[in-house]
Amino acid sequence: MTEPKLATTHVVGEPTFEGLARFIERNNITKIFVMVGAGISVAAGIPDFRSPHTGLYAKLSRYNLNSPEDAFSLPLLRQQPSVFYNILMDMDLWPGKYCPTTVHHFISLLAKKGMLLCCCTQNIDGLERACGIPESLLVEAHGSFSSASCVDCHAKYDINMARAETRAGKVPHCNQCGGIVKPDVVFFGENLPEAFFNVAGLIEETELLLILGTSLQVHPFADLALMVPSDVPRVLFNLERVGGRMFRFPTDRTPNFRASSYRLSTGNGNGSKISSGDSSNSSSVDGYDQFTLAENDETGVLRDIFFPGDCQVSVRSFAQALGFGEQLDASVREGREIFERTRRREKVVEG
């Protein structure tokens, strides 16, 4: 077998913040698709799921669950609702509790500048909404705490009442059928919202993919990164590398040998769609280690970029390269001031 040659060039030119900014300006990029995960909310004080010792899963050992995912499953909710609601009291992700981060404001700024095609988030904390990302450009793939409903009859339940009962240590029950009420977040094994599958049509229009603060271990959300056209740059902002050989970054020295065969089997890079028939939320620890999707290996051209480290810091540097670092700083300050004023008013009312 003839080995593919090592990539020598990159579709954006120079794979740096400045090079990426020049690529955006040179090509008049206005259709940026953003995928975000729990890592962008850690700076707000919300733990992510998988970090050792500090992540949410690491804190679930006292419940003696078979797996951490069981805490977010309907069978356990029905059998032992107190487990989920005790976790809910610890998380306290109801609207207004946490302040959006620099990354949230960066995405909102992209929207204001007409550069955001879609923000698809795994997060259930609602901080994308809180920082002003328009609902028309936002897909909450795993739901949010902005509403609640009965798990049996699906009747809507007043979100403020659900929050008050939860904070009082009670399990909310439906006024109509008596079933257990939960926030409208997607549990493992539940179907994702229809809005998630509608974004597949946007994938074909994507001109740049930004991936921020996600482990890419939950499907079908992670599959979105496979669906953008094969010449579209994919940029990962994360503490550590994820995605296995889904990506090939400029620092990688080992070429991928199975790209063509896997691409043919998935239809990757041709606007392929995620089927709503496979719509349940599932978790995987493989991180795509067994796959390889570096489509441009054969041509000697790369399209992936990895900016390791704190995504808040990296995004601030990226915004600076784009020429709106000061606007981002101002947006963060204003957002913090509004958040603190609102919190003070709420404390006065509660007091």
Curated annotation (Swiss-Prot):
Binds 1 zinc ion per subunit. Residues 260-284 are annotated as: Disordered. One of its GO terms (cellular component) is nucleus. Changing H142Y: Abolishes enzyme activity. It is found in: Nucleus; Chromosome, Telomere. The active site is at H142 (proton acceptor). Residues 265-284 have a biased composition (Low complexity). Its cofactor is Zn(2+). Signal peptide: none annotated. It holds the Pfam family SIR2. The keyword Metal-binding applies. One of its GO terms (molecular function) is histone deacetylase activity. NAD-dependent protein deacetylase, which is involved in repression of RNA polymerase I-mediated expression immediately adjacent to telomeres. It is however not involved in antigenic variation and subtelomeric variant surface glycoprotein (VSG) gene silencing. Plays a role in DNA damage response. Also has ADP-ribosylation activity in vitro. Belongs to the sirtuin family. Class I subfamily. This is NAD-dependent protein deacetylase SIR2rp1. It comes from Trypanosoma brucei brucei (strain 927/4 GUTat10.1). The lineage of its organism: Eukaryota, Discoba, Euglenozoa, Kinetoplastea, Metakinetoplastina.
